Amino acid sequence: MLDLDRTIDLFTDIHGHSRKYNVFMYGCAFPEISIDSRNNSIIKVLPSILNDRVEAFKMKDCKFALEKEKESTARIVLFKELQIVNSYTMEASFFGTEPEEVAKNNTNNNNEEHEDDDEDSNGG
């Protein structure tokens, strides 16, 4: 039975990714014009901690947005319907971390390919 006196502080949907290296997260963000936009820095706390403590996790590959085409994802539904600010999709590459020489070449394009890859894998 649902206990209405409790809150959900964190939701993470975990996926494998077949087109990118590393471990990274997609999170939601309030529109800049919203009074709630001050929470956008809070949304990045967990990914920042993971970036500092987990070698395979790369903050540069993370993306924080509410995209129309992703409205049906668990992360966005829970963010909007249950107001779970810390609602994420964590992606982990099937291929491991980015090889050092590839990382050096990608520094300028900041892994632009991931913009279309959100929840690409396993029915995401």
Residue ranges and their predicted role:
Residues 1-124:
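Structured catalytic-domain cores with a bias toward divalent-metal coordination
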